[in-house]
């Protein structure tokens, strides 16, 4: 392939993908980690301060899952504001995809030590935010949606295995 063909191929991809600077991607990873930390903290607080005292008289089997969903929604709002501030393309799609892909995280890590649940929450949110920020770079909306929905479905299927 000569230089002309290489530059034409590069120009085609430039038209199909929104540019994501390495610094911007690093900010998204940090923001995802912060969101994971917020989810972890809020899950604990919502479970201990709201769900168990108000709704559980005895054994409460779904308290962690419900608290995790509430925490995911609240932390998603914080993550959305951060992504908008960073200037990422399609921030709402990133937050929704990460929330759906990681929905039930509190239930997945239930029974682990607190430091393990903290690690997995921070790591998985950082990875999810970075991955979805990368996938939504596709300029046409429909192909971007197809890719994101496909990845979310794969994440949910692998989560059940």
Predicted regions and their residues:
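N-terminal juxtamembrane cytosolic/stromal segments of multi-pass membrane proteins
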Residues: 1-30
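Membrane-interfacial loop-to-transmembrane alpha-helix junctions, especially the N-terminal start
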Residues: 28, 85-96, 140-143
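Hydrophobic transmembrane helix segments
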Residues: 29-76
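Aromatic-anchored segments of alpha-helical transmembrane domains
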Residues: 37-43, 97-109, 148-160
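Hydrophobic alpha-helical transmembrane segments
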Residues: 67-82, 120-125
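Short alpha-helical packing/oligomerization segments
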Residues: 88-131
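Terminal transmembrane helical module of multi-pass membrane proteins
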Residues: 130-161
């Amino acid at each position: 392939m000569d230089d002309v063909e290489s530059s034409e191929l590069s120009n085609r991809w430039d038209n199909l993908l929104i540019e994501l600077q390495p610094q911007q991607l690093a900010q998204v990873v940090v923001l995802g980690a912060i969101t994971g930390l917020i989810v972890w903290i809020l899950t604990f607080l919502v479970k201990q301060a709201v769900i168990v005292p108000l709704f559980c008289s005895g054994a409460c089997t779904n308290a962690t899952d419900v608290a995790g969903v509430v925490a995911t929604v609240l932390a998603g709002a914080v993550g959305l504001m951060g992504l908008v501030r960073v200037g990422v393309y399609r921030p709402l799609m990133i937050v929704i995809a990460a929330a759906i892909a990681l929905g039930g995280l509190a239930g997945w890590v239930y029974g682990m030590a607190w430091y393990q649940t903290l690690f997995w929450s921070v790591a998985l949110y950082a990875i999810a935010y970075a991955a979805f920020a990368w996938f939504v770079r596709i300029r046409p909306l429909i192909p971007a949606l197809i890719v994101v929905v496909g990845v979310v479905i794969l994440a949910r299927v692998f989560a059940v295995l």
